[in-house]
Amino acid sequence: MRQDLPRGVAPSVILIDPKYPHNVGAALRACSCFDIAQLWWTGQRVTIDPVKGERLPREERMKGYRDVQMCPAQQPFDQFDRKAVPVAVEVRQQSECLTLFEHPDHAVYVFGPEDGSIPKAVLGHCHRFVHIPSRHCLNLATAVAVVLAHRRMWRQLNGKEPLLPLSEMLHEQRGLHRASPTLDSMGWDGK
């Protein structure tokens, strides 16, 4: 385990060599929405160096993302203990369909790049393999959101997480039923 990197916390998400910063940003938002504490990614195509003023696209508008630790690392699996269960999310023969997938408590979801597949060396770390039942490949960030949403619903249906009322689930103000002071001052017609 490298000391300069954080210890892996499962459940977690690992992106293998993502190509686009906006997909990393949207995956970060999905992690925040579904209570995933860490987003790891490998490769050199997406770099975020706050010292150089680099940030993810739209980061300043992403509410709640600060509860997710961003972890760029070339060997992220080394940071997790033995309880972690790496799950490759990929279109491949003999993989489990997400519809019936039973999510491990300590899952580490592994997603390949936008322009390729998960390399064999990475697949060798994975204990489970799952595919999303869609007619076409999904955008990377969309795939992350779909899997994490399914995880939340599966855990709720199996009594592992409470099914909270919307008022307790949302951590931000949304919807017309709770108008903001700005909307109140403008009126409902925007004037």
Task: Describe the residue ranges of each PLM region.
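RNA substrate-binding interface of SAM-dependent RNA methyltransferases
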Residues: M1-V91, A145, R152-K191
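Residues that form or flank phosphate/diphosphate-binding pockets in enzymes
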Residues: H22-N23, E96, S117, L138-N139
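Short, surface-exposed acidic/glycine-rich loop or hinge patches that mediate macromolecular interfaces
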Residues: P18, R92, G116, S134-C137
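Short alpha-helices
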Residues: R135-R152
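An amphipathic alpha-helix/helix-turn recognition signal
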Residues: A26, A121, L138-T142
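Glycine/charged-rich beta-loop-alpha catalytic/anionic-binding loops adjacent to active sites
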Residues: V9-V13, L123-I132
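Short beta->alpha connector loops at strand-helix junctions that form conserved
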Residues: I16, T42-G43, F129-H136
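Internal catalytic-core helix/loop-beta-alpha segment
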Residues: C71-F129
